[in-house]
């Protein structure tokens, strides 16, 4: 029995048929069923295996491809940090291959040839839950190198779980006249409902636009007619599996991008690039990694805060209830943090709306204890911002800058309800 064979597996009460695939576990047999889904079965539970059809030895062959730069199109670099947004599937085995040479990208998504001149580069190959702050700095350095080598737009392929953290980090780290677009896929490229190809087409299109800044581009609805371009510090993943999981919070998206017609419709004012400074990039990648994000809950113990202080943490983001509150029983821990020069700031776990710690006595008392209100900053953004500030400024200056708008993280509109 070889990889690629079409087999029938008999269990006690049922049978499964499909193409035999590679397995990472020697005790598990994996097959790809005709539905396109993979199933892994415990070898001990399999009563009988029948080879229905012998398969050819799997090959990952590529036809020759002649790529010539189109002088009428912009030069876009696509940097991969991992994920499946532009991977290529060998349907005989189900194996997923990274597709990050220019040739591979065009084969995976040939429509890109009509949008831009593509250069592909792998900088990381990790699951996004394994993203580390040092990788944000590595990504920023790769962006700088590509821009200085002539890239007129950057697309970063990223796993969706922590993409909003990375977008936030790059918003604080990178100052450039080139658009930086993070893109991912909620459905892998071997599934009929995959959003990978359309998202990357729309992201590359957005990267050719005359704008600057860091953005996230993902499906704007469950269908395939529109993708949304979100500001990097005002976006969050709000669903575990839907294709339109990413939403702008307390702001509308920057634009709608039709991945089929390639039309871009701006929904509000954007930051336009200065062509004369197209190769100028300023990086500030210093981060204080001893920062924690703590969700407040009924009965939360001050010992939690004391633990972080005693272990050398320099900053704490509290994701408080409502307008920015904690139980009074938590005040002791906040006093302890303040006495030890640990910067404590407050966001709200409601996600939408803004912190207002002047309404109730609880919030006013927290402010008196040195807790900084973070306006309508998302908790994840406040977490990254505090790492950035403490990595670059002294305590008092960081404390002063925390409630100020640096990279679009605060919506200063007086019309925002809270």
From Swiss-Prot:
A Pfam family reported for this protein in Swiss-Prot or TrEMBL: GatD_N
Signal peptide annotation: none
Protein's UniProt keywords contain Transferase: no
Keyword field: ATP-binding, Ligase, Nucleotide-binding, Protein biosynthesis
GO biological process, alphabetically ordered: amino acid metabolic process; regulation of translational fidelity; translation
UniProt keyword Protease, yes or no: no
Catalytic activity: L-glutamyl-tRNA(Gln) + L-glutamine + ATP + H2O = L-glutaminyl-tRNA(Gln) + L-glutamate + ADP + phosphate + H(+)
Occurrences of domain Asparaginase/glutaminase (ranges): 74-405
Enzyme Commission numbers on file: 6.3.5.-
Enzyme active site: 84, 160, 161, 237
SUPFAM superfamilies, sorted: GatD N-terminal domain-like, Glutaminase/Asparaginase
Quaternary structure and partners: Heterodimer of GatD and GatE.
HAMAP family, alphabetized: GatD
Protein family per UniProt: Belongs to the asparaginase 1 family. GatD subfamily.
Name of this protein: Glutamyl-tRNA(Gln) amidotransferase subunit D
Natural source organism: Methanococcus maripaludis (strain C6 / ATCC BAA-1332)
